[in-house]
């Protein structure tokens, strides 16, 4: 049986580390002028996928 294909959009969005899946922050693409610098600094840092979504993301990545 052939290997399962991973979802290519998911491969571009997520990085797999030590037992955790890293993701980028949302709300950073446009209309940035009205958002405070403090908020933008917080959004710059990487986040981890929430435990409720890990199973779905792993399935997309073929893990």
UniProtKB/Swiss-Prot annotation:
GO terms for molecular function: structural constituent of ribosome. It comes from the Bacteria. Keywords: Ribonucleoprotein, Ribosomal protein. One of its GO terms (biological process) is translation. Coiled coil: none annotated. GO terms for cellular component: cytosolic large ribosomal subunit. The keyword Ribosomal protein applies. Gene3D superfamilies: 4.10.410.60. Belongs to the bacterial ribosomal protein bL35 family. This is Large ribosomal subunit protein bL35. It comes from Campylobacter jejuni subsp. jejuni serotype O:2 (strain ATCC 700819 / NCTC 11168). The gene is rpmI.
